[in-house]
């Protein structure tokens, strides 16, 4: 179940403040994110797909939705990524994504299966968006954020890019991510 937790990013000390909102209501999640320029949707699921599905199977199953998003957003490159709990680079990848960063393009993800925690640092707030199966999220270019896939990741996601290079991050150097709960904590 998708969920949204909102914190005030300005707090005394190193501990995260108490959340000002915590909800699993998809309509509230979408409305709160929309107020901050973040798009959130839920697409129909394809029950035949799971974390073990190949990139080709995933892209074929969602070809109509992918074409719509590409046409609307001008996305040149689309791929599907799957990461399981036995992936040899899971710890290294997790650490890379846990550092606050921005992108020069929108970060658009659709969770085919599994889950991941997007943490968005917008002004004086940190929004933690737990995305799960059938959640689609679009984070605008320049938004400070980090992502946690957990210690034992298990997800498949479709990624949309406006450039041929794929995922390119500009790290902020801000250690704020260390003050907030991780996926599974």
Curated annotation (Swiss-Prot):
Keywords: Amino-acid biosynthesis, Dioxygenase, Iron, Metal-binding, Methionine biosynthesis, Nickel, Oxidoreductase. This is Acireductone dioxygenase. It comes from Synechococcus sp. (strain RCC307). Pathway: Amino-acid biosynthesis; L-methionine biosynthesis via salvage pathway; L-methionine from S-methyl-5-thio-alpha-D-ribose 1-phosphate: step 5/6. Binds 1 Fe(2+) cation per monomer. Binds 1 nickel ion per monomer. Coiled coil: none annotated. Fe(2+) binds at residues 101, 103, 107, 145. The record marks 109 as: Important to generate the dianion. The record marks 100 as: May play a role in metal incorporation in vivo. The lineage of its organism: Bacteria, Bacillati, Cyanobacteriota, Cyanophyceae, Synechococcales.
């Amino acid at each position: 179940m998708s969920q949204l937790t909102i914190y005030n990013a300005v707090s005394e000390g190193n501990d995260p403040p108490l959340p000002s909102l915590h909800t699993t209501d998809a309509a509230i999640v979408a409305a709160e994110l929309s107020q901050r320029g973040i798009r959130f949707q839920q697409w129909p699921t394809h029950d035949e797909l799971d974390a073990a599905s190949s990139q080709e199977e995933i892209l074929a199953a969602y070809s109509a939705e992918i074409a719509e998003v590409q046409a609307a957003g001008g996305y040149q490159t689309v791929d599907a990524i799957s990461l399981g709990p036995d992936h040899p680079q899971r710890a290294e990848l997790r650490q890379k994504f846990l550092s606050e960063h921005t992108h020069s393009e929108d970060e658009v993800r659709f969770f085919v299966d599994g889950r991941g925690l997007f943490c968005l640092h917008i002004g004086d707030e940190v929004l933690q968006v737990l995305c799960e199966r059938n959640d689609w999220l679009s984070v605008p270019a320049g938004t400070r954020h980090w992502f946690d896939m957990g210690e034992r990741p298990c997800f498949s996601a479709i990624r949309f890019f406006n450039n041929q290079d794929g995922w390119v991050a500009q790290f902020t150097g801000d250690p704020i991510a260390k003050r907030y709960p991780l996926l599974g904590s």
